[in-house]
Amino acid sequence: MSAQAGAAQANEDESHKYWGKAEQQFKHKPASQFFDPCQEFADRSIKCMRRNAGDRDMCTDYFQAYRDCKKAWMTQRKEASR
């Protein structure tokens, strides 16, 4: 049992080491680089594909909504960076 506890501690230490390297970068990046506001549209289109056995023709509205969202988001990001 103590060998498992030691392995768990080693895994935890290793994950903290990797997070420590990324933490500073994560905290100093704009939120948009870690959050996709169009993720809900992407999830809905995937659910539609699963519901319709992969028939893309049944999900065109979902795909278009995702493309419109992504286009608006990219336009907004470009304007914000000016």
UniProtKB/Swiss-Prot annotation:
Keyword Disulfide bond set for record: yes
Residue pairs linked by disulfide bridges in the UniProt entry: 38-69, 48-59
Transit peptide recorded as keyword: yes
UniProt xrefs under InterPro entries: COX23 (IPR051040), Cys_alpha_HP_mot_SF (IPR009069)
GO biological process, alphabetically ordered: mitochondrial respiratory chain complex assembly
Motif stretch (Cx9C motif 1): 38-48
Record's keyword terms, sorted: Disulfide bond, Mitochondrion, Transit peptide
Stated name of the protein: Cytochrome c oxidase-assembly factor COX23, mitochondrial
Organism from which the protein derives: Coccidioides immitis (strain RS) (Valley fever fungus)
Lineage summary: Eukaryota, Fungi, Dikarya, Ascomycota, Pezizomycotina
UniProt gene name: COX23
